[in-house]
């Protein structure tokens, strides 16, 4: 296939990936979408008819020559950190092995550039499973010889949907004193940042949204929108609570452990976008939340 500066989008059926796909399509960029099943095809066909079906977490053989004819790979591929999104795959399988398989195929096929959406906290010293999987892939990407940009978003607004779901159940947990600050970002705004680095950009950038709030302020916004009671949970109790699921469900433990970390430490990145958390909350359809 002749190289026509085609871009591969991995993780193309998630909220971030779909917006990346949409923006690239609007720019007239030829795009290939990687999806995992035929059932997902209708999500991406409004933006491209170049669709590959494969599960990168199964290794290179399942996606062999996926990147043939590709100039740039954009990967928004990763496991959901939501407590209400169970998945059989581990963070190691989804965030590391799947991206590594795509990277190996990209190197083999002479891809020029790789843009990867990681997470803020990937470089923390403590051995969080979620952060570790991203960090392992970041290291692989750095050593690959490809041009790259690694984006570390501080968090998505949609990542706080768990609190909205709990608010429907009349409780909004806040770990610690709630004074840790963050400037989480809307997935549409983050997609625009990702696409802006499509052809070139910094090696690593930490990306946030337009406004900085404390965790308590965000909980109060959720309460104003949905109702519920804000309940402060001491950090020590949260750590004990996160450890208990490890006996039964390693993935749930990983999510709770990392949630406690990010909500008790400042998670602030370079300001981008225009959509506020209050605006995001106003668009939530509570009937669609479990």
Predicted regions: what is each one?
Residues 98, 175-198, 203:
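Substrate-positioning beta->alpha
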Residues 79, 83-168:
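Glycine-/Pro-rich loop/turn segments that contact NAD(P) or position catalytic residues
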